Design a protein with these regions (language model features):
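Acyl-donor (CoA/ACP) binding surface of acyl/acetyltransferases
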Residues: 1-38, 53, 66-181
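Active-site rim helix/loop that mediates acceptor-substrate recognition in acyltransferases
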Residues: 44-63
Length: 181
């Protein structure tokens, strides 16, 4: 893990490395059928626990993984947003999963903007993608706000290979050109 661990700050949010204390909120998100609709469905607590540990481990092994997203005003965990690249994944992704209570407030785009800046500047990525279900209109809107465009259908690794996705993407050059405007 980078030392010190990264912490990003936006106008309303703090993005930090996940920790054990995030588990109950993380499990609530994993148990919410509406939130998990495009992410493989509801997950039992044991699976959520393994995923949290894998995310924390990824920070130590790879130096990146999704951040925990905390509202500054309440100190409340509202989701996870950030860089990921699983084995067999179609590219270097900035992904987002927010608790339903946090939907519709611009938090996903705000956090993903900070995470994208970080991935391009600190990780040196040349491109980011977002793997989005064709009928996930809300995530498509977030991708558009970030400046990403739909590149076409994508192929996910097992166990997600049965779920069709569209790849949205943009290059580092496109990102920084838009940010400079």
């Amino acid at each position: 893990m980078p030392s010190p661990p990264p912490m990003l700050e936006t106008a309303r949010l703090i993005l930090r490395v996940p920790c054990r204390d995030d588990f109950e909120a993380w499990a609530a998100v994993g148990g919410d059928a509406e939130v998990m609709r495009y992410l493989g469905g509801v997950q039992p607590r044991f699976t959520v626990w393994k995923n949290l540990l894998a995310t924390i481990g990824s920070w130590h092994v790879l130096g990146f993984a999704p951040f925990s997203v905390i509202r500054k005003d309440e100190g409340q965990w509202i989701g996870r947003v950030g860089p990921l690249r699983h084995a067999g994944w179609p590219g270097t992704e900035i992904g987002w999963t927010l608790a339903r209570a946090a939907w519709g407030r611009g938090y996903a785009a705000e956090a993903a903007t900070a995470a994208t800046d970080w991935a391009f500047t600190k990780l040196g990525w040349d491109e980011i993608i977002h793997c989005i279900a064709a009928d996930n209109i809300a995530s498509q809107q977030v991708a558009r706000k970030l400046g990403s465009v739909k590149r076409g259908p994508g192929k996910m690794p097992a166990p997600y290979d049965e779920e069709p996705v569209e790849i949205w993407a943009q290059s580092r050059e496109e990102w920084f050109a838009r940010r400079a405007q």
